[in-house]
Amino acid sequence: MAAFALLFVAPSCESDDTDFSQIIADHDTVSIRNIQFNDAEVEDSAEQIPTDIADEYFDDYIENQDLNRVVNIAFNGEDATVSGDLTRCRILRNGAHLTVYITGKKVYLKVSGSTRNGSIKVYGENKFGIELCNASIHNPHGAAINSQNKKRMYVVLAEGSRNVISDGADYIDTEGEAQKATIFSEGKIIVSGKGMLQVDAQARAGIASDDYVRLRPGVHTQIISHGTHCIRANDGVMIDGGVHNLETFGNAARGIRCEAFVKMKSGRTTVITHGASVIEDIDTTGAAAVKADSIVVVSGGELRLKSTGEGGKGINAADYVQTGGTVMVVTLGENGLSSPKGVKSDSRITIEGGSFYSYSVNSYAIEGTLVLKPGAKKHLTAKRYHIVEY
């Protein structure tokens, strides 16, 4: 087993029992990196689609499904037309607000057209697909796409399409039902395809799942949230590739918020937060680009994070592990109710490969027990920055 060097960094103390000959503590040698949205294409790493039905994630891949019962939904202003195979679903219409009752397997909704007062709500007990083909759906009073189905929802972005999904500031809730985001599902959300998904969230999160969210290679997303988080999930967020630009303006809001883990394999994800800290009950909570209750793992790709608000953090997790890829974190906020940090871990910040950069203008770049695999080509550290390159 390879030896690792440990360095504990916290606001109250610093101790280093290892000879880091490469450490340079000169602020003038390090500049604040510019982090902004980048829509350019990225070369994703090769995707390994499971072929063994016993694989834990076999069903996450639409290629392993046979969703051949195609239902066409075309929005047209205050109305919508429905055609195709309706043998395994029933659709009720109220203007451009559609309620889909899935009664059998293999249902695949193909959605096109535009509405400023419409939505799709899905009930059922079977996984289903929803392909967005240059669709524009705005629901002024709730989620634009709302799956009350606890099975997987495969969101497919048609190749070359640009899809705009948005909510309004005034939600009307149904008793006993959740609608936590502009795109919400009680089950897993798997996003794939070679198109663009733009989500404009006014009141609640952009995309939310009561299970987990997976973003597959080739997907382009832009999620702007004015109220709360951009992506929210209970059981995991997996970024397998693609280009993702997330920005949130809400106080104590997070770009990516997960009650379990966040894992990034490939692609480029940029997250910018602007919100300040708030007091909830007796606890103080602040904004963060990425917040995970368990672990954040980066094995590849490019993760670019910036928090500008008071007390905002780049990464806030119980544990952080990086084995590859490029991570850049900048926090610009002032100290206030909460203290800004580049990367904050309740346990360890383990870096075994790739490139790591964290800069905090007004506080510590990292907080936690730093564990470095030997062999780094560069290691620069001071209170406000920390850089490691392999």
Regions found by a protein language model. Name each.
Residues 1-6:
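Sec-dependent N-terminal signal peptides
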Residues 9-12:
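C-terminal motif of bacterial Sec signal peptides marking the signal peptidase cleavage site
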Residues 14-390:
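A composition-driven surface/loop motif
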